[in-house]
Amino acid sequence: MDSDLISSRCVWATWNVYNGRSLSGTPLAERDGKVARKMSENGTCNRILTLESMNPCIQKVEYAVRGPIVIRAVELEKELQQGVKKPFTEVIKANIGDAHAMGQKPITFLRQVSAICLYPELMNDNKFPEDVKQKAARILQACGGHSIGAYSASQGIEVIRQDVAKYIERRDGGIQSDPNNIYLSTGASDSIVTMLKLLVSGQGKSRTGVLIPIPQYPLYSAALAELNAVQVNYYLDEENCWALDINELRRSLTEARKHCDPKVLCIINPGNPTGQVQSRKCIEDVIRFAAEENLFLMADEVYQDNVYAKGCTFHSFKKVLFEMGPKYSETVELASFHSTSKGYMGECGFRGGYMEVINMDPAVKQQLTKLVSVRLCPPVPGQALLDVIVNPPKPGEPSYKQFMAEKQAVLGNLAEKARLTEEILNQSPGIRCNPVQGAMYSFPRIHIPEKAIKLAQAEGQAPDMFFCMKLLEETGICVVPGSGFGQREGTHHFRMTILPPTDKLKSLLERLKDFHQKFTEEYS
C-alpha cells in the first residue's frame, strides 16, 4: 500500500482516538472503562480519570481548523525536512487566518511601541520616533510598577479601555461608548466564550439554545458543546453571496423552540468562513428580529477592517442599533467583539481583544466582572498592542505616513488576492466561488464524484475531508473541509485563506484547480 495513504489513514485513526473512538469504532469510554475496572480488580491500577469518567462534554468538542488535515500537514513538513521524496517541495498551510505565519510583515509602529513597552531602555534609542516613545511611556505609566510584566485590572488597563471607547466613538460617528462597558480579553475568542458561559443555563427543554450561522467558525460549535448548550443552526444563502435571510432565522428559531430555550443570536460580520459583508438593511432586520423574539445579540466583528468588494461597507451592530432609535437602543442586549489578530494587523500571537456590552443588567455585569477576575487579567502585552491599534498615529505625527502606507499596502494586497481567488477558482467547471467581499477566506463549493463519495463513506470520512486529504498528499496544499464548518446536506466545500503572498497564492490556486480536474477524472 502507498506509504502516504498509510500515513493519512493513520492520521485519521489518530483523530478517531482523539475524539473518543477506538480503531474498531467502539467508544473508547466503554472500552477503557472496562479495562480500568479489570486492572483495578487485579490490583495493578485504578485510574480516576478515564474517558468514561471525564467530562463528556469535552469529548464532543471539535475544532476543524486544527484537525486531522493539519496534523498530517505537520507530518509532511517533517518528512520533507528528512529528505523524503514528495510530488511537492513545500507544504502551504492555507488552513488558518494567521497573517504573519504566511509572510505578512508586521506594522512598524505597532512593533516599535511594543518593543519599548517590553524593554523600556529602548526609550533612549534615537532610532525610535518621538510619537512611538510617547505612546509607550503612556502605556507603561498605566501599568503596575510601570512594567507590562505586572498584572492589570481584570477588566483591563483603564487607560486602554478609555482608548478603546474613543476608538468605538470615532468608528461609529460619535455614538457614545462607556469604558466601563469595555472588557479587554485574550483575543476575541476568550470574551466570546465568557459571554456564552453567562448566557447558557437550563436542562432538558429549558437548555439554552444559541443560533449560529452555518457555515460557522468552529469556535462556536466547540464552545456550545463544552457548555452543554443547544446549537441551533441557521443557514446562510449560498446562492445570494452567503447573505443572511430573516425567514431562515425565523424557521430555525421556530423549530428550536420545540426542544430548547433559544436565547442568543450570533452573527459573524464580515463572515468567517464565507467572506460576506452584511448590508445595513440586513443588520437592521436582524436587530428588529432580535427585539421581537427577545434574543441576546452577539456580534463577532473581528474582520471589520477587512472589506474589499466595491459597494460593501462595514456597519457595526452598535452603530446601527443606536441609529434605529430608543425603541431598540435602550432595549436590545448586545455584546460585540474585536481582536488584534485580524484586520491589517494580523498580530495573532499577542492575543489581544475586547468586548463591549450594551444594555446589560447591572447585576449580571457584576457577575461578568467576577467571572473575568477568576483568570486575573488578559495578557498585558496584548492589551498594550490593542491600545496602539485603537490609538494609531495622527496626521502630522512622525510615524503617520509610514503607518498609513503600510496599512494601506496590506489591505490593498488582500483586496487583490480576494479578487484573484474568486477569478481563478471560478475557471474550474467543478468549483464555484462566491465573491470574497471581506474577511480572509474563500469558501468555494466543489463537485465530488459519486465514486469518491462512496469511497469516503466506506473509510468513515466526510467526502470533502477525503478530497482535502488527497489534495494535501498530492500537492502539499492544506485547506479545511467544509464539513468542519457546517454546510447544507449534499453540498461540499473547503475553506482556504487568501493570506499567502500573491505569487504563491496564484500558484496554489492553479495547482488546486488542476488537482480538482484530475480528481474528478479519476473518480468519475
UniProtKB/Swiss-Prot annotation:
The modification N6-(pyridoxal phosphate)lysine is found at residue 342. Its EC number is 2.6.1.2. It catalyses: L-alanine + 2-oxoglutarate = pyruvate + L-glutamate. Transmembrane segments: none annotated. Pathway: Amino-acid degradation; L-alanine degradation via transaminase pathway; pyruvate from L-alanine: step 1/1. It comes from the Eukaryota. SUPFAM superfamilies: PLP-dependent transferases. Homodimer. Belongs to the class-I pyridoxal-phosphate-dependent aminotransferase family. Alanine aminotransferase subfamily. This is Alanine aminotransferase 2.
